[in-house]
Design a protein with these regions (language model features):
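N-terminal compositionally biased, intrinsically disordered segments and leader/signal-like regions
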Residues: 9, 27-29, 247
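Charged, low-complexity interaction regions
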Residues: 20-28
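A detector of low-complexity, intrinsically disordered, Ser/Thr/Gly/Pro/Ala-rich segments
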Residues: 6, 24, 243-244
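C-terminal non-catalytic scaffold/interaction domains in large multidomain proteins
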Residues: 33-249
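Hydrophobic residues in alpha-helical segments
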Residues: 19-20, 84
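Short amphipathic alpha-helical heptad-repeat segments
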Residues: 5-12
Length: 249
């Protein structure tokens, strides 16, 4: 965008975008998730960042059972929901690890895995969570991803395959939008780095292809002569007639 003249639409848009990129209490990821829980949203780019928040196993009330099968269904379902609320969208591998740690078990055999799959399916059928492949989350968590720093997780959990596409897409959009214009590999590398991943390997590049293509399809970023720039929808904000939130996107 060319230099804006005071009083022009460009100047207003730049002010609007600056305010969004420097979020107040109503522009945080948590605030937008609460909004979209009530109103429904397709996508909201959030601009605050946070450390990866891990579930406290002591909060899940699962210990004291000799076998995983002895855990009451209601207690297991409640534990899954608490983990999802804290870490969602969460990969099945991490979800399983959290449940095992809370219940005092070291590994998940076929029977334990089956119970966890059944719990996910049951909660999904009830509409309490959304299932996307091996990921579980509240519906608004997929529409409003939070940008998290994964660097404090152990190596076994800190894997790109454990990060949902929506969070990877958010990191790409944020990286491009906050920088201006970036070559694809640079955007991918910087997007990974801000999430706590060290470098862009061939596998990482492959992993980021689908989120990047989706961001391009949604006009969150655009391709300019082979480089990436912020798209017209990067700053879009949903609104309802009764809500003061407006959009210039």
């Amino acid at each position: 965008m060319s230099a804006a003249r005071p009083g022009t639409l460009d100047a207003l848009i730049q002010v609007h975008q600056h305010l969004i990129r420097n979020p107040g209490s109503t522009e945080t990821c948590a605030a937008w998730r609460a909004y979209c829980r009530e109103h429904g949203c397709e996508w909201v780019t959030t601009w605050d960042s946070q450390p990866y928040r891990k579930t406290n196993p002591d909060d899940l009330s699962l210990p004291g059972h000799g076998r995983f099968d002895d855990i009451p269904q209601e207690a297991l379902d409640e534990a899954v929901l608490q983990i999802v609320d804290t870490e969602g969208p969460i990969h099945l591998f991490i979800l399983t690890r959290r449940l095992l740690d809370a219940a005092g078990f070291s590994r998940a055999g076929s029977r334990i895995q089956a119970r966890i799959h059944e719990a996910r399916a049951r909660l999904g059928a009830q509409g309490l969570i959304r299932l996307d492949g091996e990921f579980s989350g509240r519906p608004e968590q997929f529409a409003v991803p939070c940008l998290r720093d994964w660097s404090n997780l152990p190596d076994a959990l800190r894997q790109l395959d454990h990060v949902h596409d929506s969070e990877l897409m958010l990191s790409l959009v944020r990286t491009v939008t906050e920088t201006g214009t970036l070559e694809r590999d640079t955007a991918m590398n910087d997007a990974l780095h801000r999430m706590g991943f060290i470098r862009l390997t061939d596998n990482a590049r492959d992993r980021l292809q689908a989120p990047l293509e989706r961001a391009l399809e949604m006009a969150l970023v655009v391709n300019r002569n082979g480089d990436l720039e912020a798209g017209p929808k990067a700053f879009h904000r949903p609104r309802s007639p009764a809500d003061p939130i407006t959009s210039l996107g």
